[in-house]
């Protein structure tokens, strides 16, 4: 993936993942270190656990449009 140190983020185009699900955040359970994100997609709910820091940096909130990237070992979130 392409990492831009000026933005401290990866571009969506640079991420090579087969299973991508566009959806809307329906619930955020925020913890001190990790947060659980429920994303409503056309295929159903996808749940991801990401750092609370990432939730804040991406400015994620209920209703945010995101893409859930599903790999065999993880589910990642990118804000649209």
Residue spans of the language-model regions?
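Non-catalytic connector elements of ABC transporters
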Residues: 1-80
